[in-house]
Every structure is written in C-alpha cells, then in structure tokens.
C-alpha cells in the first residue's frame, strides 16, 4: 500500500507540468509528511480543461453515512478496481492524477522497529500516481475524496513491500484522464525495476506528526 508521501513541487510548477488551471485552495507546499485524510493535490480533466485541485486522501463510498463510516480507503488495487462496488464507477468515470515528489514505505521485520524507506523516481522527476475520485455528500456535508491505485510490487520494491503505487509517465496521463479514449486498463502495470530509487531515511517519519526536509534525507544503512 501507499500510506505516506511528500510533495515539494511549487504550485506554479505543478500548474505548468500538467497545463492545468489551479484552484485557489490548494494545500500548502512543501509538505514532507503527507498523511491520509488530509487534502492532497490532484489533477482532473473535463471538457478539454485540466484542473489542479485539492481532494481528501481517503475515498468515501456514497453509502457511508459519515466520513469514518467504514474502512479508510486510501488505496485501490488495480486488479480489482473495476469490480469492487466502492470503486468501479470511479474507475470508469472519475480518474485523476496525484503528483508527488516520492513516497515512504516501511520494511517490517518481526520483533524490530519498522524501517522507513523513501522512494522516488530514479531520474529525479516528480512522481505522478494514478488515482480515482468521488464526491461524497450527506446532508450539508460535502467532500471530494480520492484513493491511489496500486499494483503488485516490482522486483526492486518487493523486499520492502508487496504493493506499489501505479506510477504514470507523461505519455500515459491523457489515457488515464480519459482524454485519449478507452484502454486505461492497459497501463495498470508495475513500474520498471530501474525506474525507482530507494533510500533509507530517519525513523522520525514513523510519526505522522513529524515535519521537515530531514525526513527525506538519506541515512546510512
């Protein structure tokens, strides 16, 4: 799964990268410890216009009576996303991009403190995850929510965790956003093994309250 990430890109850079119109209420950057249930940056496309907009990280199905009315759905498995009642309509009709600098994952060994790793693209470019989104309404409450699509881990990721966010390249963005017709299922594949860089980082990030650039600074193994 992907349960923590960081975003250091300025809003202007994101706007230019996606050729998107930015909302006025985007989350502040940089944020070196982005956690579930907070607003994150997303990109959607409608009628030929891309929009950079905030969404709550944590997909809320329409039948939830309240935001915490069931399991916290921060990820959606690519293998079952088109079949699960919570996700299937969003998979067909409401797909988004989720820009990040990288994400954290923990290698867990029984009896030991979880070991945090910082994962980025090996070429230094920003990461862009595939996402799905949903408007949730109950009475006067309204939230726009999202989840990150995941795949099986590639061989490089597998020693740390068995899942990996679905990482999209720029040529895949139009297809995922529905701008280039159908066939998005064809790009739901694990990233190539050489596409990712893995670095050990401080256990400070084990706390969801930790902040600061030191969280992504590599340490000796």
For every predicted segment, state its role.
Residues 1-221:
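Short linear sequence motif anchored by a di-proline
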């Amino acid at each position: 799964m992907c349960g923590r990430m960081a975003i250091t890109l300025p809003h202007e850079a994101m706007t230019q990268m996606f050729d998107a119109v930015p909302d006025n209420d985007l989350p502040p950057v940089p944020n070196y410890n982005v956690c579930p249930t907070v607003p994150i940056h997303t990109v959607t496309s409608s009628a030929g216009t891309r929009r950079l907009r905030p969404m709550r990280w944590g997909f809320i199905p329409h039948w939830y009576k309240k935001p915490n009315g069931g399991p916290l759905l921060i990820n959606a498995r690519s293998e079952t996303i088109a079949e699960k009642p919570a996700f299937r309509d969003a998979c067909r009709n409401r797909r988004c991009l989720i820009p990040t600098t990288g994400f954290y994952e923990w290698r867990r060994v029984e009896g030991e403190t979880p070991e945090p790793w910082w994962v980025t693209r090996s070429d230094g470019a920003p990461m862009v995850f595939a996402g799905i989104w949903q408007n949730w309404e109950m009475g006067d409450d309204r939230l726009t929510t999202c989840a990150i699509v995941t795949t099986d881990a590639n061989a490089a990721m597998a020693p740390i965790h068995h899942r990996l966010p679905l990482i999209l390249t720029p040529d895949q963005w139009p297809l995922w956003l529905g701008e280039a017709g159908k066939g998005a299922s064809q790009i739901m594949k694990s990233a190539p093994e050489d596409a990712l860089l893995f670095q050990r980082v401080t256990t400070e990030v084990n706390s969801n309250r930790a902040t600061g650039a030191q969280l992504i600074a590599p340490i000796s193994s």
